[in-house]
């Protein structure tokens, strides 16, 4: 029994240390990507993390669903270049605030016409809405191929890797990890080196900060 208890204690300690290390790395990724700004042609879409809780509301009203904006900068012919993700409520004010931070005035934003996306013009960007009508057919529209492919890959990766993390509390960090990796996918050699350098130069992150609901600057 002693051996069993001792092994359990070691396992709990190791899990806690692994969690802290993981979130320190996620925080570094978040800080590295926090100043990311997109320009040129940009596809945007509304997206959600999480699913229905047992006995909870279905669909977008689920208590476990977290909304976030997905934006993918592309070439003029639609090939993806960079991505920008942020947890937010789909209101015009929230999108306007995000646009001022994440879009250059030269951005040409393509959206599905959701009312809140009119807020992208707050950055000086131009907006070209295309009302899709929703449903399965809407994801096949060529104007949104890059962002739809990106979101499909993101959701598949999350479903296969993360099964029980707190979407509401830690979505910013996990989305930052996806963004960090995607934006460096064309030169994988810089991912580890850049992460080590950024981590070494960042200030210490005590556990209470890492467990806080919002990322710390």
PLM features per residue range, with description:
Residues 1-217:
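Residue-level recognition of single "structural anchor" positions
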């Amino acid at each position: 029994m002693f051996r069993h208890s001792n092994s359990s204690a070691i396992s709990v300690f190791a899990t806690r240390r692994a969690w802290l290390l993981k979130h320190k790395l996620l925080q570094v990724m978040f800080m590295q990507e926090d100043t990311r700004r997109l320009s040129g042609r940009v596809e945007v879409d509304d997206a959600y993390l999480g699913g229905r809780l047992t006995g909870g509301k279905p669909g977008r009203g689920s208590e476990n669903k977290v909304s976030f904006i997905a934006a993918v900068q592309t070439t003029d012919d639609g090939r993806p270049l960079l991505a920008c993700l942020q947890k937010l409520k789909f209101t015009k004010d929230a999108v306007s605030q995000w646009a001022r931070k994440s879009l250059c005035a030269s951005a040409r934003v393509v959206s599905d016409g959701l009312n809140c996306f009119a807020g992208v013009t707050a950055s000086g960007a131009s907006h070209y809405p295309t009302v899709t009508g929703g449903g399965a057919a809407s994801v096949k529209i060529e104007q949104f191929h890059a962002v739809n492919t990106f979101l499909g890959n993101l959701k598949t990766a999350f479903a296969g890797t993360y099964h029980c993390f707190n979407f509401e509390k830690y979505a910013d960090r996990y989305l930052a990890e996806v963004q960090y990796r995607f934006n460096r996918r064309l030169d994988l050699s810089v991912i580890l080196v850049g992460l080590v350098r950024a981590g070494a130069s960042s200030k210490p992150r005590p556990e209470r900060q890492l467990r806080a609901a919002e990322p710390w600057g």
